[in-house]
């Protein structure tokens, strides 16, 4: 096992010396998530490296029992079937930061990979690092900590109060360091544990020096992972300034780095979970549960709600049955990332393909959005409108108007809808809402239920006919053709 010691590096390469130019076909493949093989482009002979990538498994000790093992184990067995060379786990292993929770994760790891070997006897490398939950829980008095254990002395068994080096050696048979460097089949991985005493913030102390000391080969990709993401790489946060982010500044010197971030629990069906700027980054989904972008009537939280003073009319979408993971395959000329619905053993969308050497910005939001197609409803699809008595998210009983519609799945080269724009209009009145579908975080073959958007009756004008139109939108906000309008009352 690598002990985290690294060498001093020479000068770094410029961005343009690494990135090349792409054909239009490759750019379209990157936007649509298509494998260039299908487009007849030149490819390497075979995979050089296979890595399972997952995050936020949240092993949980609750009432002296452990939870969280089902989907973690299932993801590991999928990686075993695909003959992964390594598994990268991007933090939040222990939900409440308890030693017992980390021990449980190690137990499951060795259950699937006894002696650190796959079922075919070949070795597999564990590339684990800690997140804020691992060093949080009781230590930072998070409100969810009370659920973690009935043991009043549980804080004394928290990782933050223990010798993490001794625990890491005991569980994973390797030395622990705040930033560890490993090499798998000639490819380097720089793994940054979440800082022990950081309850807020993202800065990794010593990151720039560690990246330089790792001395990555400029002619091939290398990999970096930390738990909390660079905010400007998050879906819905792409416009946030990166200029003062110390992690971003350190990574921006290496156009050949592929960074994996956890923490955000974003739906990997969202194309913006793949980001490219000065380097390339992936926001890794949670194998435990999903969160969503804000700003939708049924967003996971009220964050980014355009009108925070108004109670949302819908409960948050049920993301607790979302269990996702990724699988990364490295070739000489490309990296391919498969997106997985672990619960249903199905794809969450077309594979992402990152050409090597990567074109200048071809995987950026701007480039992919420019060539992305809008989703479309199936032919003959219709919306309906009804009235009911219900409760808004503030649990207030209100009269509501419900617009119901079918999901817009991928077809004819068009993508699955990420969300839906529902417009209520009347003379002198217009109200726009956005919603996620009921099962947006499941593989689309499992998304069979009707979805809806709920309006408060008091939000609509009295004495006027209100017309509702529904349009499906892709990850970049581009909406397709609307369903035939429906009127109320």
Each language-model region and where it sits:
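N-terminal secretory signal peptides
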Residues: 1-14
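Beta-strand-rich modules
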Residues: 460-477
């Amino acid at each position: 096992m690598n002990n985290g010691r690294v060498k001093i590096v020479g000068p770094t390469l410029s961005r343009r010396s690494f990135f090349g130019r792409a054909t239009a076909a490759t750019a379209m493949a990157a936007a649509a998530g298509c494998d260039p093989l299908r487009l007849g482009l030149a490819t390497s002979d075979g995979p050089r490296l296979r890595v399972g990538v997952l995050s936020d498994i949240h092993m949980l000790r609750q009432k002296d029992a452990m939870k969280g093992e089902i989907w973690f184990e299932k993801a590991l067995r999928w990686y075993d079937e695909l003959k992964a060379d390594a598994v990268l786990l991007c933090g939040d292993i222990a939900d409440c930061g308890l030693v017992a929770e980390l021990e449980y994760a190690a137990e499951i790891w060795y259950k699937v990979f006894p002696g650190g070997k796959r079922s075919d006897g070949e070795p597999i490398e564990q590339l684990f690092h800690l997140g804020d939950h691992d060093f949080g829980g009781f230590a930072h008095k998070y409100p969810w900590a009370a659920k973690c254990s009935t043991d009043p002395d549980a804080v004394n068994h928290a990782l933050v109060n223990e010798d993490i080096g001794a625990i890491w050696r005991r569980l994973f048979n390797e030395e622990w360091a705040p930033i560890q460097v490993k090499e798998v089949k000639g490819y380097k991985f720089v793994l940054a544990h979440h800082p022990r005493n950081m309850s807020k913030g993202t800065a990794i102390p010593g990151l720039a020096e560690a990246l330089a000391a790792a001395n990555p080969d400029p002619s091939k990709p290398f990999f970096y992972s930390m738990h909390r993401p660079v905010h400007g790489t998050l879906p819905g946060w792409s416009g946030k300034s990166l200029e003062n982010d110390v992690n971003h500044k350190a990574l921006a010197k290496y156009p050949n780095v592929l960074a994996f971030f956890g923490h955000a629990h974003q739906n990997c069906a969202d194309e913006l979970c793949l980001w490219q700027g000065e380097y390339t980054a992936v926001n890794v989904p949670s194998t435990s549960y999903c969160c969503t972008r804000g700003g939708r009537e049924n967003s996971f939280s009220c964050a980014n709600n355009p009108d925070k003073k108004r109670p949302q009319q819908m409960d948050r979408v049920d993301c607790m049955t979302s269990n996702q993971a990724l699988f990364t395959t490295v070739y000489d000329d490309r990296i391919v990332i498969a997106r997985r619905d672990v619960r249903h053993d199905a794809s969450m969308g077309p594979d992402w393909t990152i050409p090597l050497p990567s074109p200048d910005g071809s995987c950026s939001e701007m480039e992919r959005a420019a060539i992305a197609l809008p989703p479309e409803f199936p032919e003959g699809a219709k919306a309906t409108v009804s009235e009911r008595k219900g409760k808004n998210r503030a649990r207030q009983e209100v009269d509501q108007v419900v617009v119901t519609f079918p999901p817009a799945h991928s077809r004819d080269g068009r993508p699955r809808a990420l969300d839906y724009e529902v417009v209520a209009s009347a003379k002198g009145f217009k109200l726009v809402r956005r919603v996620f579908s009921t099962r947006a975080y499941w593989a689309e073959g499992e998304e069979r239920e009707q979805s809806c958007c709920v309006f408060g009756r008091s939000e609509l004008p009295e004495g006027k006919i209100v017309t509702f139109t529904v349009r499906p939108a892709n990850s970049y906000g581009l909406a397709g053709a609307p369903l035939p309008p429906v009127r109320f009352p």
